[in-house]
Curated annotation (Swiss-Prot):
Top EC category: transferase
Recorded name of the encoding gene: panB
One GO BP: pantothenate biosynthetic process
Protein name in the entry: 3-methyl-2-oxobutanoate hydroxymethyltransferase
Protein source organism: Bacillus velezensis (strain DSM 23117 / BGSC 10A6 / LMG 26770 / FZB42)
Binding annotation for Mg(2+): D43, D82, E114
Subunit-level organization: Homodecamer; pentamer of dimers.
Lineage of producing organism: Bacteria, Bacillati, Bacillota, Bacilli, Bacillales
Length: 277
């Protein structure tokens, strides 16, 4: 399994880091077999798995439950788990308690925290406590209400400078890696030069040290539409629906199960069940 130092070396050597989300055992198993470098158990599971309207309703217990499943499916892959909405904002004590629960109970290798202002101290506290932290700046879904919707961040000079400053502060606070979401490609390239930690992009251009996408977006499963920055490599929903429809049809028409799908009983035993008749 790759470690924090391996990811730094990959950045130094110019080798792209591949991160993908996963939320259960089979997804994680396939991701590891495909050769991803890191798996993110994102709070995006609220929308793509649990059917919620946003990530806000996801709990610490949800993250622990899904990370456990992912860990079983990808024992040799570095796993990052999101700290969900308001689990690291109330107090330092609550932050450490929630983080410890996720790490100890789920087996995650690192935790991801969204935001800059108000979060630097949490990054520092977790790092000092021995928990690796991945920072997330730009479009931060947990704060989408404050940001005014799902919009590209850092498009004007003031907000661009703020993103650069916050990226540097995240590293100074101890973050091992930085995720930039929906940020102009040129700004991503600038931030990449300003920090020594790997920068992972999602809708942040090709100059980042690596990329992350949501599993369901990549394979075309359960999503009605995908963001501009997504490249969809398959559309498995059609295949799945066809298989399920075939099953329904065969049962209704009594085509399934066939004899080869059934178990047989010895005729003598069968006669005994009917009173020897």
């Amino acid at each position: 399994m790759k470690t924090k130092l391996d990811f730094v070396k990959m950045k130094e050597n110019g080798e792209p880091i591949v991160m993908l989300t996963a939320y259960d055992y089979p997804q994680a198993k396939l991701a590891e077999q495909a050769g991803v470098d890191m798996i993110l158990v994102g709070d995006s599971l609220g929308m793509v798995v649990l059917g919620l309207d946003s990530t806000v309703g996801v709990t610490v217990s949800d993250m622990i439950h899904h990370t456990k499943a992912v860990k079983r499916g990808a024992k040799n892959t570095f796993i990052v788990t999101d700290m969900p909405f308001m689990s690291y904002h109330l107090s330092k004590e609550d932050t450490l308690k929630n983080a410890a629960a996720i790490i100890q109970e789920s087996g995650a290798d690192a935790l991801k925290l969204e935001g800059g202002d108000g979060v630097f101290e949490s990054i520092r506290a977790l790092t000092l406590g021995g928990i690796p932290v991945v920072s997330h700046l730009g479009l931060t879904p947990q704060s989408v209400g404050v940001l005014g919707g799902y919009k590209v961040q850092g498009k004007d000079e003031q907000s661009a400078k703020k993103l650069i400053e916050d990226s540097i502060k995240c590293e100074q606070a101890g973050a091992m890696m930085l995720v930039l979401e929906c940020v102009p490609a040129e700004l991503t390239a600038k931030i990449k030069e300003e920090v020594s930690i790997p920068v992972i992009g999602i809708g942040a251009g090709s100059k980042a040290d690596g990329q992350v996408l949501v599993y369901h977006d990549v394979v075309g499963h359960g999503v009605d539409r995908t963001p501009k920055f997504v490249k969809q490599y398959a559309k498995i929903d059609g295949t799945i629906e066809s298989a399920l429809s075939g099953y329904v049809r065969d049962v209704k028409e009594r085509v399934f199960p066939e004899e080869k799908h059934s178990f047989q009983i010895n005729q003598t035993v069968l006669q005994g069940l009917y009173g020897g008749k």
